[in-house]
Amino acid sequence: MNTVTDQPHSISVNQLRAFIERIERLEEEKKTISDDIKEVYAELKGSGFDSKAVRSIIRLRKKEDHERMEEEAIIQLYKNALGMS
């Protein structure tokens, strides 16, 4: 097994290489998924939907109900304070 012993702790070169290669594969998959998501947003926009509004909905759906309700209450409070409601 190849090891690097110049460091205070020995590092397995093979293990390090495996970690790096896994990260590289995952980064490539992440790029592919990101490209797929962009395509879906383009289709969505082409169908007449507002992509900005859909992004907001997706962001809100990731939150727990109580977090979402708290955020909406704070936004409403700020809008009221600024005379926007």
UniProtKB/Swiss-Prot annotation:
It comes from the Bacteria. InterPro entries: GapR-like, GapR-like_DNA-bd. GO terms for molecular function: DNA binding. It holds the Pfam family GapR_DNA-bd. NCBIfam families: PRK13694.1. Belongs to the UPF0335 family. This is UPF0335 protein BQ12070. It comes from Bartonella quintana (strain Toulouse).
